[in-house]
Amino acid sequence: MENVQILWDFMHMGQALEQADVSVGFGCYDEDIPRRCAELFHRGFAPYVCFSGGLGRNTDKLWTKSEAERFAAIAMAAGVPENRIILENKSTNSAENLLFTPKVLAEAGVKAERIIAVHKPYMEKRLLASMQVYWPDVQAVYSSPQVSVEKHIAHAEQIGMTRKGVIETIVGDVQRMELYAQKGYQVPVEIPNQVRNAFDALVAQGYTGQLA
């Protein structure tokens, strides 16, 4: 797991929390994301929660209900009032998340000058790089469920992901850091040699199922 940990640590930023207008939970297979958003709501960091996601990579094989709707149900079970939740349930990838979410918030009359962007721990850096292309005028702090890589994998296995599938998704998202920057989907981020070597080792071991 050493190479997986190297990728995880590179992608995870661990920024300090700040007050925001709304927390935005980005859809995926990780059901700890709405729990983190609920925690931030109850701690008073943001008075509204927006969940963004239809069905996309991985979840289209797991669920029939949209990521946003599934996350909202989890947040409400954790005590977030329904009238404090905004849903964007049409997006199928990160770019659409970032294009559709500001429109949904504006339509709901929710100010979104400052947000807490909540994603998987290993998506924080990629989300930041994408946000600068698709939602550049928003001030954002990046957060995620406070879990280790092993705990993240264990939770993912509970909802139908496989251990290999999670590791492949981590590998695929690291690949997209460079690939998507070349395509203009996110700003470039320098990738250290240690991260490149860990990525290459995992690809050589067969973790290729989520490569673009």
Give the positions of each predicted feature.
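A structural signal for short, hydrophobic/glycine-enriched beta-strand patches
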Residues: 1-166
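A conserved mid-domain beta-alpha-beta active-site/ligand-binding segment of alpha/beta enzyme cores
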Residues: 156-212
